[in-house]
């Protein structure tokens, strides 16, 4: 089996851009998820982060409480692990290519989500993932997964 592609790098280096460009060249049906941090802060000065199906066109992605997985600013974050656990695992069960854009620290307590990610990495469906270079147990397990190859950008 070919190794899964795990792209690791700081915020803003182009992980998601690279994934979008690779997807544009692929003919495989896409599964998995994408997250998006809005550029407009909420009333508390926090930036909302949403999770959506990777196959859903950007203009069709709802930015509503159902898809909110957390908020953050430069110093703190509020996490909604139950949202990761509810939304994420079903998105990682089908597709010819599983996109995970991106894996980070907000899902530290989302154990069902983490298990689904690791199960996907154990599986035969190719994975294309963006990973924050943070030091958490979950992210270390993803980066060190024997079926993945990490590319640092």
Cite the ranges covered by each PLM segment:
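Extreme N-terminal starter segment of soluble prokaryotic enzymes
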Residues: 1-4
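The conserved Walker
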Residues: 11
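Post-Walker A alpha-helix
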Residues: 18-19
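Phosphate-binding/switch loop-helix module in NTP-utilizing enzymes
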Residues: 68-118
